[in-house]
Amino acid sequence: VKIWSLLPSATEILFALGLEDYVTGVTHECDYPPQAAYKPRVTVAYVDSSRRSAEIDAQVTERFQRGQQLYGIDEAKLREDPPDVIITQDICPVCAVSPSDFAGHMEGCRARVVTLNPNLLEDVLDNVRQVGDVTGRAQEAETLVRSLEQRIEAVRQTLAGAPRKRVLCLEWLDPPMPGGHWVPQMVQAAGGIDGPIEPGRPSRKVPWEEMRALEPEVIVLMPCGFTPERAARESAVLWDLPGWSQLSAVRKGEVYAVDGNSHFSRPGPRLVEGLEVLARILHPDRCLPTTPTGSILKLVSPPAGGSTIGNSSPRFEPFA
């Protein structure tokens, strides 16, 4: 069986189920586990993800307004070595390749298309089972799911009765956008009070005044596609928001930059690590570190002058 994974989280699931030898195509973003980087790349992005947050947002908006796709498929590879199974997603046309990106290239291709559409943590676990069923690895999938469920329950038990803090998670910085889908649920499970998006609902542009009115005690920066270092660096733009510097979380240094790709944006097994990261941030007295040093960065000082006008950046340091 030849499998194309057009979703980084699906690639992680396939490798976790021991199916790496059957994966013959992955996306340009599939970088975990490290071995995935050696698989043939069968997609391309038409948006420059190296640009700053506002520029990326502008590119995406412009392409949508023109009816243009954000991603493309290597049609030559599809014809030369067609897969038997294609795994894709239909949850977010911005985050990853979706069926509309390759629908026009499927003529003559008899591959079975498996579309994943998770909204909550339990949906992600069901996706693991779904991939296991499709690939003949149902038993391995169930074993993986049970292991993840045990870790989720361990966090809940550890934090039972713990005081809850108001949390604002930002999955984009400019414009600021609160985390959606499974992120609010993760905040709740990690002992926090989630922000303006209901669990299971997609992220959307929320007026800054509405987010500011939540008076968050903790702010977690988790931009899609950003490392903690990049999130920390580009967070300088937030100091230009009205009232940002006066927020309790900012004044007390309770602003954290985390690895969005690894632990929050991709609906795969590592979301459970993300839950453990949130639990560590919100309740360091109860939760020990579970990820390498540098996975969480904590605000130490704001930009010079309190804004980006001086071209300085806020300073973050590893959170032990």
What positions do the PLM features span?
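N-terminal ligand-binding lobe of clamshell/alpha-beta domains
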Residues: 1-320
